[in-house]
Every structure is written in C-alpha cells, then in structure tokens.
C-alpha cells in the first residue's frame, strides 16, 4: 500500500490491485431471491483469537487470488488484534463462522457500534475481514451481517472488485460503492518475475521496457509463454523490433492480472507498435478471480 501514490510511481511502482467499499442499509431482503443458498451451512459465533479454526479458509482464498499474502502467527495476531482503548465506542471484535459437516467454510470478523435515532436503532456493523470458500457461503454470511438487531447499516471496506455483492443486491445504488486503490507492485528483476507467474493464454511479444532506477531491466525483451501452470515460459533479451513499449511502472500494474495493458494503451501509458499486441498481452496477463489485497501494511 502506498502512503502517497505519486511518490511510489516515481520509483517504478504500478497500481496492481483495486478494491470496492460499500455501505449497505439494513434489510433482511437486501439480497435478490435468486442468490444461492446452502441449507447445509450453519452460522455460529466464535472467539476471534482462535484464528486457527478459520485460517484454512483464508489460505484457500489466497491460493486463488493473487495479491493476498500468506500469514504466519504474527500476521494473524495483527489480523485479530482488538485493543479496547482504540475501539472508539465500538464493540469488541466478533467472529462469525460458516460451517457444515466438512468444517469451516467461511468467516467474518466485525464490530458493532450502537446508535439511536428517535428511539430507533441505527447502529453500524463494521466488517474487518470476510473470507468465504464459495458463493453460497459468502451469501449466507452477507445475510447475517445485513440483518443484525439494532443496526442501521453494514460497512464493508475493500471488497474485491469482482465480489458478487453488487450483482446480488436488489438495490445496489443504495450501497454507494466506491472504488479505491490497493497494492502497488514494483518489478525488480522483470525477467525472473515474468516467468514466475502463470498466464491465461499463449503469448509471444517483444517488450521495450523503460526503467530509470533498475537499469538491468531497461531494454528489449521477448516474452514467450504458454497457457496454464505447466506451460513453458521464457523472458530473454532480444534485438527484435518492439511490439509494446512501456515503463516498468505499467508492467508492475499489469503483473498480477488486475490491470489490462489495453486499458493502459488507451490511457497513453503503453505504446503499441504492432496492432493487436496489447489485446494479446491483456488476454495472457488476465487473471480470474481479480487480484486483491485488503490488508494495509
């Protein structure tokens, strides 16, 4: 996360993940009737400091979403930290688990803050973290959070940009979605970085890269990759004519698959010297689900 993005941009960091923040008014019927359910799922409250009970859910999501860092005990301690003096009138941190006979399949860490308007409860649910292994489990947790007693709205900061919630809400406008920036990525050894990730489609493209701070990245590179985990990948210097010209900042932005090189070309940040090269590279670099990093560090 960048304290001031323009500073990081000067040193080659590109905006690689985004998130969406929403404020959902309380409504037991907030979700459309067609939203998936799972009758086998049960919800129960748990001690948030017993994070080992739900850590597996986080790690499962992290293996599928680029940008989510793995956590050791110190990181988990930070994730569930609850300092009474810093609550600002909110409740202690709470945890709800979604589980079935196979075990825990989702969880949410949240706090509530009481407030009354003319004797009517209008408090706020503030969600610190929400992870689910699949859509039905995610929907069950949302239903719970959107109908807590005495609450007026639920605040969900930094959701993935492809989270299904806005498609599930019967009135998404009332959620006031706001798009925000997230993780900034800097490629230090671009050849090693580009062969370390998988690609969604075959690609053979020549990149002309500018890098003011890491001169070993500067120059023309041929990136040739196959699709999938086991496909061959190579990134080597070449004297072939460039097909895409870009700064290392923009390569960092595209690296996790959340920023399209075609978008950057449209914005004038990438120069396309061979027609179609940006679209081909965008298809190869793309990743679903979208990259995401809700943790601020």
Place the predicted regions along the sequence by residue.
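Active-site-proximal cofactor/substrate-binding loop regions of enzyme domains
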Residues: 1-30, 52
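Intrinsically disordered, low-complexity, positively biased terminal segments
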Residues: 33-297
